[in-house]
């Protein structure tokens, strides 16, 4: 860390050098291929590695200040370790630190110093100084020891020190909590995507220099181990990690460092991405997860290198980034190719063109050219690729200068020039970066590393960036998207991006517009690339939420959107409020984006974001994203959608192959991957998206409740803590009873998304609503890692109540509880209105957008269309709380629409507002309930007309005497009578269906238990995935059946031939099931059979029943699939 810090402070040149070294190290560590790619890298490898290792080993605390002292702790069992602490901390804090390091309860530890037990006071009081030796002896209790009670969240939090809490709240490092619930442990990793500018900057810069810390910020989740990798990836990983947002990060980080994939850098990256994507639930799973998440993640590994190769020196950086970005561990051998592809993807993601070019094979030169053409690209390339997610971009941006320098050194002056030329481009990039991790922030803050870049960016973005960074930046993830976007937009779809941007709303923000124009200008070449990008992109998309969006975008307007993102990010920085929405966008960071978001929706931009976030952004974006997908990728659409899914999931992994293959194939692959990643995918997408979102939200996970409650309020805190403990218990029970809900519990990645969906849903302000809808954003990426390890990612936006006036999370441990609480509460099951749903656009394209959740479910699209006047439908759903006529009628419409949608294909099923309903039914129900009490509270007696309108032409008359909500009906018109009867029947049917579903679920669970684990799991996952993929095309009613059947089918025929195209899934629920499952299987073959199968299966059911499928079911499936 110190080294890294030193590096940071070093001169720009030195820093670049360092960055190069880091990159090299990363490369070296992560991917051997990289080494060859760049000589300079190689030399540096050693020190960069060193730094990485240091980083990996040191904890965030170490990063702390130079004022720390090192204490040598020797245990009675012979293990020795050192801790670096500040001399003024209390003995209790030291015990907490040690307890956390050893993962034991602090009351079980006894510290002796000079034969004296340390009990209270500060370290200074006991004359502890640098190098002091402390003997650690365990407290042993004799006698009958009752089963230790479950740890409460409070106890878990007590073991945290202020530095950890502050680092978490500032987005620097993820917060890891371990809780014991009955006989199993739950590891929770929370990551805020937000970083304060300093942090953000650090993230990028650090990555460059030491990489660890900066990345860490970005990656946050990936912080320690990931971080190291990150540095290599420099921004990439970071981005990913950011994306990871946390859960995955943890595991991923470890894995990454280890090089879970063989390539350490890559691994890390992958872990980070994977983390991002899914948030690995446990560390071990995390690695897996990460790879699964990003199945492609694996690819990424190889990728990384490969990427580098293609670009040559540029690639080198590229590779790094890429690799990181990819962070996949994709096969190493594959790696090369994949690399390429991935690279492209990333690139493309980043800069389509460049990616594409790279993809082509002539990639190197192309890339170079592209780079030249697209500074952004180059930046991206340098780091975007790494991140592949956007983050990389940001990294790249951050690194941009370094990159540039490297590249320049390498002979890619073009890039540099472009960078220089394209201030805007740089700007955008930084913005993206900012999003990404605050790279902008860093540059802004710390110019030396990226002087040139920062100069480019600094003026316009400086503020924004900083601002962004704090909130948006946090959007690292987001930003990654942003980054991606920005780069990607430019590169990937420069043309698109410009067009999109312009149309989309880039223009809305001047900065965005500028960025866009820069991007556009910058990426003229890419215009050609887009298709390729598209092709490839989907995979990348999968790879990283953000990336994916770019990739998608390129197809259509993604990049525009992305660009918008980037721009947005920048702007957004200023607006905290948008965080929820922002989340949606990759650039969720951008405050602005939020608004834009909506815009984009319309534009189709969303889709880019959507993808990335598809799940995550879940609602707003997702719905838009679905649209987007639709629009934007009309041609590629299917693949895109799939990609979106996959992307989130891990299409990347398939991406390489798929990239080469046709889009549809890729799509399938992706799907498969998704499936593999499935939980991951959905989760991933979500996760990544989520992450991104979260990033945007400064404290991504605040819960509406929190917002409602005064954070400082002790009573609230106690309650929040209790709720949280209960929720966790529920989660863990569910997980272990095969009903994993999102949580899987294993990891609760920050709950950014949770809010985010809501926000996106438009209820940006009403925390409650957002939360509700936001839960939709919850990513359900639960995977089951072997024996009882599950991971789930939740994300949401930070509740405004938890933010200080700069939009940063309040510095207080209680904030953590509230964040966690909201996160979890937002999950569909627990959250009042939460819904996870992947909703298909009306067109029926199956996009990963699923975001019914944000949108509130039932038809997110619908809902957005109808535009509840309350941003969140979910609120509407609970008509009890809120029955205004407007809402009611809206609800009605909505419900109708949603029904049609659902049945139509549009199926936007949402994960029910009401726990186990399809949203449409829920909506119906809600509306019916409101209707039946149609005289809503808000209506006054004299408002029969409004009543009428509300009931769609009902002519009932009410007496006016009754001032309360329930007016007596004087005369009920026929229409209402019929309606009421229908309602009743419908609700009865729904209930029946629900009961049946539950029975069926139980049966399935039993079957799954008896069957071989993998198959069952995959089937399940597939199930949910396919439904998701299907986008709820099937009629809602069919949904449940479809889902189930899908599951059974899957179980029965896990490896159907892949003859059926994925599209089928989209097209018809039944088909989709079959087709999907077969696809999934196919995919599975390619990458993770079970997972894939799961995915496809999942896709099919989801398609049909997203709304119907109970959250558990889906989650369960996901887990299993994973």
UniProtKB/Swiss-Prot annotation:
The yes or no answer to whether the keyword Nucleotidyltransferase is present is no
Q: Which SMART domains match?
A: UBQ (SM00213)
A Pfam entry, by short name: ubiquitin
What the entry lists under PROSITE patterns is as follows:
UBIQUITIN_2 (PS50053)
What the record says about disrupting the gene is: Homozygous and hemizygous lethal at the pupal stage. Hemizygous escapers display haltere-to-wing and metathoracic-to-mesothoracic leg transformations and die as pharate adults.
Region ranges (Required for interaction with Pc): 210-300
Q: Where in the cell is it found?
A: Nucleus
Q: What ranges does the record list as Low complexity composition bias?
A: 266-298, 375-397, 612-627, 648-663, 746-766, 856-867, 889-903, 922-936, 1086-1107
Q: Please provide one cellular component term from the Gene Ontology annotations of this protein.
A: nucleoplasm
Question: Where are its TM segments located?
Answer: none
- Biased composition, class Basic residues, residue ranges: 300-310, 321-352, 596-610
Supply the alphabetized keyword list.
Answer: Nucleus
Which ranges are annotated Polar residues under compositional bias?
937-954, 1071-1085
What PANTHER family does UniProt report for this protein, alphabetically? MIDNOLIN (PTHR23010:SF1)
Q: How does it assemble?
A: Interacts with PRC1 complex member polycomb protein Pc; the interaction targets Pc for ubiquitin-independent proteasomal degradation. Does not interact with PRC1 members Ph, Psc or Sce so does not appear to be a member of the PRC1 complex. Interacts with 26S proteasome regulatory subunit Rpn10.
Domain characteristics, as noted in the entry: The ubiquitin-like domain is required for Pc degradation.
Q: What else is known?
A: The name 'stuxnet' derives from a computer (PC) virus of the same name, due to the role of the protein in promoting Pc protein degradation in the proteasome.
Q: Which function does this protein serve?
A: Facilitates ubiquitin-independent proteasomal degradation of polycomb protein Pc by interacting directly with the proteasome and recruiting Pc to it.
* Protein name, entry field: Midnolin homolog
Name the encoding gene, please: stx
